[in-house]
Amino acid sequence: MSGHSKWATIKRKKAATDQKRGNLFTKLVKEITIAAKMGGGDPTGNPRLRLAIDTARSNSMPMDNIQRAIKKGTGELDGVSWDEITYEGYGPAGIALIIETATDNRNRTVADLRHIMSRNNGSLGESGSVAWMFQRKGSLDVPHSAVSEEQLMELLLDAGLEDLDQDDENYFTVITDIKDLESAKKALDEAGIAYENAKIDLIPDNYIELDADDAAKVMKLIDALESNDDVQAVYSNMELSESAMNSLSE
């Protein structure tokens, strides 16, 4: 899963920029609202809401904002009704893309996405065109400074660990089945081991390695997509060559 690890490294380095962009809280509020609408406002019985709240809190969202988003989802406060729509397509160098959106206007969203893709050497595809290349998994990152590889594997083998990616120089990436992500988090919490970026992820079965030039083009497209307020997440099967990794890390 080296491609996943390198991509996760770039995503972590982008996180500060993404937050400054100003639309991070908008995306988090949408996710909380949708999760509360679908599964109720009690996070103890709603894993998706619990994960959304944890993500919001890790990004310093005030509890008042979180509670308002929950109440909008449960109908206690008036709010926008969001439709979740997933789009698929291809970017530069044939990279597969899955784009998850939450929108109150489907026509606007698809028009915006087509415009962004066409301006960045990409194109939208039909439903199912690339989804078969990905698996939905749980993932989280554990700093090397918090635990050894042996300790981490021993701790999580009975908590749903499927794969442990060690390619990142600072983090282990833990991969689980979706249903086991909460068990992995609980095991780490009980052991007092810090972790970051716990989430449901789309992980490709195979990666396409890109050189620095193509990687920069794909990153430009992904940045443009993620800047759109209707886009909640973008997934790709891009793997970074060492030259691309060094270039994007500068």
Curated annotation (Swiss-Prot):
One Pfam family named in its UniProt record: Transcrip_reg
Q: What is its main location?
A: cytoplasm
Q: Which InterPro entries match?
A: Integrase-like_N, TACO1_YebC-like_2nd/3rd_dom, TACO1_YebC_N, Transcrip_reg_TACO1-like, Transcrip_reg_TACO1-like_dom3, YebC-like
One of the record's GO molecular function terms = DNA binding
GO biological process entries: regulation of DNA-templated transcription
Record keywords: Transcription included? yes
Q: Which Gene Ontology CC terms are recorded?
A: cytosol
Locations listed in the record: Cytoplasm
Q: Which superkingdom?
A: Bacteria
Which keywords accompany this UniProt record?
Answer: Cytoplasm, DNA-binding, Transcription, Transcription regulation
Q: Which family does it belong to?
A: Belongs to the TACO1 family.
Q: Quote the protein name from its UniProt record.
A: Probable transcriptional regulatory protein Cag_0165
The record lists the organism as: Chlorobium chlorochromatii (strain CaD3)
